[in-house]
Amino acid sequence: ERLQAALPERYTLVQELDRGGMSRVYLARESLPERDVAIKVLDEELSARLGRERFVREVELTSRLQHPHIVPIYAAGDAGGTLFYVMPYIAGQSLRDRLDTEGLLPIEESLQITRQVAGALEHAHDKGIVHRDIKPSNILFQSGHAVVADFGIARALRAAESGGEFTQ
């Protein structure tokens, strides 16, 4: 595939995991270090509107967020004009998946998830970063803990979609 040819050699695409209006997420295998990763690839039109410099700036800001309940960004790049970033592959379900299959969650578990997500948001806010797209599909479960995905990148994507500039 064209995307595979454009990605750095250390990544081998395994399968598409999710597709949205502005991006696709792939399971990939990284060769060094050897591990499974998720690669989020932005739509080409959105990549062009966003611009490499703005994207890199947002990824650099987001990559500074080191918190147990925030999905880290390992790397980012430009694959033939298509912007992408690499994060850990999290095999667990999203909160959206759990709510769809289980309905209401027990109150104690709901409170635990809320505390973990609030801790992640507080950490980011302390660093001047706002998620702006917090929703059940961006809350994933890893080893029984809630982790927030797409941190900071949502701000860049919304700005590019609307033609606006970044704000704090």
Model-derived segments and spans:
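Conserved ATP-binding/catalytic core of the eukaryotic-like protein kinase fold
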Residues: 1-168
